[in-house]
Amino acid sequence: MMRCSQVLLILTVLLWSTAVRALPEIHSWTTEKGARVLFVEARELPMVDIRLVFDAGAARDGDQAGVASLTNALLGQGAAGLSAGEIAQSFEQKGAKLGNGSERDMAWLSLRSLTDSKLLQPSLELFGKVLAEADFPQVDFKREQQRTLIGLEYQKQKPKSIGSKAFYHSLYGDHPYASDPSGTSETVKSLTAKNLREFYRQYYVARNATVVIVGDVSRTQAQKLAASLADALPEGVKAPVLPDVASLDAGKDDFIEHPSTQSHVLMGAPGIRRGDPDYFQLYVGNHILG
């Protein structure tokens, strides 16, 4: 499925960021709370990249399109009584970087820090609060909601955005992957901070998480680090498996008229699972096409 491929892609990107040249050994285990861990020891630079990936993307929106994206956007905007400014300043003082993002099939929260214990430990403690004690302040929720609504109106003027939305809807039909991560103006307007808190409590849990660690730490250190982050989260339950994507019975063409000087053409079909024996042949072939 998409999520497995995305998690492995994230791991690959993190490896490149730490200048790994040889094929690394990927260690994997599960914490007592049920979080899956992927770890690569990379000693080239005195830093560590940590990313917690949750099955909490737009495919989990249901009839509240946009809730996954807004929930993720509010992480780091207020946690454990700290404001967004206080959180950002604290990470900056330690030379650490907080990141987050959300797509159709996953959402994540990340930390990059130097491995000096005087910097790493307090960064991890703050990261744990952002991860597990998000406040979703009303003022920040209203700001992000308005920003999303402005973005949705802007997308209505962009041929690329119009085409992309139509493409996913045509390709996936009633499947959850058809849901646009940004939602619609109607659904986003109807969302409340309470909706975000409920989504957060359901999906940002240990059993629904994959912890990716790459950097200048030993496996023992990584085990302690992963356990501390997983322990900060409620155990929860893993999100149910999404239904398989149906294959197209036949090709079809969709045309959308739009006043523009250029035409945008999107073409595609549901792919194959990563475990398929032909996956890498198709992957390379797709890159050859550009």
Regions found by a protein language model. Name each.
Residues M1-L8:
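Bacterial N-terminal signal peptides that target proteins for export
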Residues S17-A19:
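N-terminal signal peptide c-region/cleavage motif recognized by signal peptidases
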Residues R21-M47:
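N- or domain-start disorder-to-order transition segments that initiate the globular core
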Residues V40, L45-T71, A84-V130, Q145, ...:
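M16 family metallopeptidases and their MPP-like homologs
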Residues A84, A88-Q89, D135-E153, S218, ...:
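Acidic/histidine-enriched alpha-helical segments
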Residues K160, K165, A193-L229:
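Non-catalytic, conformational "gating/processing" segments within enzyme and secreted inhibitor domains
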Residues G173, Y177-P181, T210-R273:
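An aromatic/glycine/proline-enriched structural segment found at the starts
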